[in-house]
Regions:
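Hydrophobic (often cysteine-bearing) scaffold residues that line and stabilize catalytic clefts
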Residues: 6, 47, 140, 144
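Charged phosphate-binding loop/patch that engages nucleotide di/tri-phosphates or the phosphate backbone
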Residues: 130-171
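Unchanged
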Residues: 41-138
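Conserved N-terminal beta-strand and adjoining loop/helix that marks the start
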Residues: 1-21, 40-43
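A short gly/proline-enriched turn/hairpin at secondary-structure junctions
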Residues: 35-36
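A conserved beta-turn-beta hairpin within the catalytic core of GNAT-like acetyltransferases
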Residues: 29-32
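Anionic group-transfer/hydrolysis microenvironments
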Residues: 18, 27, 130
Length: 171
């Protein structure tokens, strides 16, 4: 076990009108791994501000295009595999402790632009939130299961239908 600290981060589950979750395929990986937007919390920055900043930096989605649905009052933690400790984040962190936010996307797909000044994703898509854990790198699967469980009451029995206004639900 390492004495390194955890990196403070914010994570975002962005759902569309059909209750699907946004995922991006990481630019810096050769793996077929996808993830939701996330990133570091700057010193002195509150987690919600970090989440909306990261969402903008990674997807081009501005804060006026989202509505906050839920924000669990807890942190979610994962450890890097031993072979990655010391190799990522300049060797400063053992993993991440994350605050997660569930946002409803109010915009259109054209409002999403992953070709940002410092791109993180090479492609993106909307998926059923239930598929999230199987699409991420193995060391983040437990965290994604926990995040999904925390947001499930807001996603409804069909994973998302409760969060979608009745008029916008697929027929």
């Amino acid at each position: 076990m390492t004495d390194l600290p955890y990196r403070p981060c914010a994570g975002i589950m962005l759902i569309d009108r059909q209750g699907r979750a946004f995922v991006g395929q990481r630019m810096d990986s050769t793996l077929e791994a996808w993830q939701m937007p996330q990133g570091g919390i700057d010193p002195g920055e509150d987690p919600l501000t970090a989440a909306t900043r990261e969402l903008w930096e990674e997807t081009g989605v501005a804060s006026d295009k989202v509505e906050l649905i839920a924000a669990p009052d807890r942190e979610f933690v994962y450890d890097l595999p031993d072979e990655l400790i010391g190799k990522v984040w300049k060797g400063k962190w053992r993993g991440q402790r994350q605050r997660w936010f569930l946002f409803r996307f109010l915009g259109e797909d054209g409002d999403i632009d992953i070709a940002t000044p410092h791109p993180e994703f090479r492609s993106w898509r909307w998926i059923d939130p239930a598929d999230l854990p199987r699409l991420v790198v193995p060391f983040k699967r437990d965290l994604y299961e926990e995040v999904l469980a925390a947001f499930r009451p807001h996603l409804g029995p069909q994973i998302g239908m409760e969060a979608v206004p009745q008029a916008d639900r697929p027929r």
